[in-house]
């Protein structure tokens, strides 16, 4: 029904144009004089243009989107140029062009607007450019460009939506961090990697779950009694620089800062060629196994570009599940914006497993810890668990605190 009404509306407007020409001609014939005939001859080209416009194949034009970069980092400017090429130079009085923006771009400040009016006339090729000052992190999809034209009085209008799909991945911001490789101390704390250590297979540095083939003498009876599971001692030669990084995807106003700091940590570790695995659990679980190098960095950054604050399970549950799957020595890094009882629970489980744990709390500015957070911080520090409160864009030397 709506289609029929729309078609009837367009037909009515199309018939109105020759009717106006006939009326002005009759008026000129009856009235006579210069003014009457001038009005008629003035209406003839306008009327003919309005009659021809609906038959012009604007859809045959070629529309392209050209951007200033192929890859972006959050906060960078986005500049796009929309170009239109026509095969037939039909005269166009005006042309309204609008590049339809992705949802996350609509609230961004624009130096030049994504909608413009051009007066191409007989030109076959023309373009316009718009700019967005800072773009947000994420995967953004452009779908189409709308082009609209019409006659002088707006009686006839023609609008075409061109499909111009483009997808851009905007990577998270990061800060250069000076990373120092860490090794597990005999009990708690850390040692710098450039310190020469004497390896002694008679010294136990941790415990892990029992695996077939382990010697009877390796069983740690105290840990076995404490956990009700058979636990095996880990010895000094098993020490490594392996890192496992967890990001807390709990909804928070500081989630973007958490992503930025996590990206900075990941980049610092992998640029030093240290092996690292990465765990991110929200509505879906994402796990990157232990690896190093640029390939691992690229994969994790791609994930961090898309990650959302959509956690449905406590972080402590994710930490517990992952630690049950690994047996080799590994340093755990937790990145969060809230030092909650759940983080304390995760730290307690890591301590039971004799895992080295680093907790980084991201805050906007100093003195923002709540009374509960201060209480948990004091409790963890008494247990010699490293907890560091870091502030936005002041991340450079966070690892030097660990080595003290």
Give, region by region, the residue ranges found by the protein language model:
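Acidic, glycine-rich A-domain
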Residues: 267-404
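Extracellular/lumenal glycan-associated context and N-glycosylation machinery
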Residues: 1-64
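An amphipathic, basic-hydrophobic helix/alpha-beta surface used to engage anionic
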Residues: 45-294, 331, 335, 349
């Amino acid at each position: 029904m709506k289609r029929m009404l729309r078609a009837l509306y367009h037909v009515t407007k199309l018939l109105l144009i020759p009717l106006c020409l006939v009326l002005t001609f009759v008026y000129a014939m009856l009235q006579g004089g210069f003014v009457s005939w001038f009005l008629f001859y003035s209406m003839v080209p306008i009327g003919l243009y309005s009659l021809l416009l609906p038959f012009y194949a604007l859809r045959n034009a070629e529309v392209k989107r050209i951007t200033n970069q192929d890859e972006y980092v959050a906060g960078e400017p986005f500049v796009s140029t929309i170009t239109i090429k026509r095969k037939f130079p039909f005269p166009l009085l005006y042309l309204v062009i609008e590049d339809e923006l992705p949802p996350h771009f609509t609230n961004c400040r624009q130096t030049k607007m994504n909608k413009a009016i051009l007066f191409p006339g007989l030109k076959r090729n023309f373009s316009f450019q718009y700019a967005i000052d800072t773009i947000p992190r994420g995967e953004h999809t452009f779908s189409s460009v709308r082009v609209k034209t019409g006659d002088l009085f707006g009686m006839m209008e023609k609008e075409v939506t061109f499909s111009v799909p483009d997808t851009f991945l905007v990577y998270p911001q990061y800060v250069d961090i000076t990373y120092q490789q860490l090794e597990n101390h005999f009990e708690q704390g850390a040692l710098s990697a450039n310190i020469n250590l004497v390896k002694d297979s008679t010294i136990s540095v941790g415990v892990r779950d029992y695996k077939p083939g382990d010697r009877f003498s390796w069983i740690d009876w105290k840990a076995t009694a404490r956990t009700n599971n058979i636990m095996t001692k880990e010895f000094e030669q098993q020490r490594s620089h392996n890192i496992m990084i967890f990001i807390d995807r709990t909804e928070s106003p500081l989630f973007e800062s958490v992503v930025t700091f996590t990206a900075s940590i990941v980049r610092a570790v992998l640029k030093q060629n240290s092996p690292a695995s990465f765990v991110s659990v929200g509505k879906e679980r994402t796990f990157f196994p232990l690896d190093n190098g640029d390939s691992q960095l690229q994969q994790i950054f791609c994930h961090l570009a898309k990650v959302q604050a959509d956690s449905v399970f406590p972080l402590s549950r994710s930490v517990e599940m992952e630690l049950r799957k690994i047996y080799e020595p590994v340093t755990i890094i937790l990145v969060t914006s809230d030092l909650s009882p759940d983080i304390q629970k995760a730290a307690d489980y890591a301590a039971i497993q004799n895992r080295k744990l680093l907790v980084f709390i991201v805050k906007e500015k100093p003195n923002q810890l709540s009374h509960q957070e201060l209480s948990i911080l004091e409790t963890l520090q008494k247990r010699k668990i490293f907890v560091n409160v870091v502030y936005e864009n002041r991340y450079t030397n966070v690892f030097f605190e660990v080595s003290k």
